[in-house]
Amino acid sequence: MLAGALFLTACSHNSSLPPFTASGFAEDQGAVRIWRKDSGDNVHLLAVFSPWRSGDTTTREYRWQGDNLTLININVYSKPPVNIRARFDDRGDLSFMQRESDGEKQQLSNDQIDLYRYRADQIRQISDALRQGRVVLRQGRWHAMEQTVTTCEGQTIKPDLDSQAIAHIERRQSRSSVDVSVAWLEASEGSQLLLVANSDFCRWQPNEKTF
């Protein structure tokens, strides 16, 4: 897997990193896309999990001040949807926590909080490695005739994807009445198709000014 292999070489590409980055990786259960903004000691990160088959789309938003996690905001788009929110003070102590689903609010246990903090640290470490390794997420609308993509930034490009990835996109496109959205990763080691879907990825993609 391209993203996994890049962890081995991430540290050699750590100069002049941009403040706003998009990256991602594939795991067993689905694709994870990550948007991140670094401003001084502050880090704002959004991770979007899209399942391959079963499961629910999930967004996880985190904020750090230095090494201290200050916010966890998780939305699980199940039926009914679930929101999990926790805030921490500048010493790292918990100041607010809540789980809400179908109008019912519940407190979180200490074990649950510890698990969410662990997952936050885990995704931060993965994001650090992908960012330093310059693994870049690109996404946009596929144009089957030209095999090009109009990215969410408005550029029309031809992704450097292998024939297997192109064939997968074309199969999905043949079953859709609209141009499918595609997401892929680019790095010095090559490109990897990450996700294909009917939904419009650009409609909700974060941008640097408002993130």
Please annotate each region the language model reported:
Residues F7-A10:
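C-terminal motif of bacterial Sec signal peptides marking the signal peptidase cleavage site
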Residues S12-N14:
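Bacterial signal peptide processing site
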Residues V32-R63:
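Post-signal-peptide N-terminal segment of Sec-exported extracytoplasmic proteins
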Residues S78-Q132:
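Surface-exposed, polar helix/loop patches in the mature regions of secreted/periplasmic/lumenal proteins
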Residues D128-T150:
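Structural detector for short beta-strands of small beta-barrel domains
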Residues Q155-Q173:
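Beta-strand/loop nucleic-acid-binding surfaces
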Residues R172-Q192:
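Flexible glycine-rich surface loops and low-complexity tracts that mediate binding to linear polymers
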Residues A187-F211:
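OB-fold/S1-family single-stranded nucleic acid-binding modules
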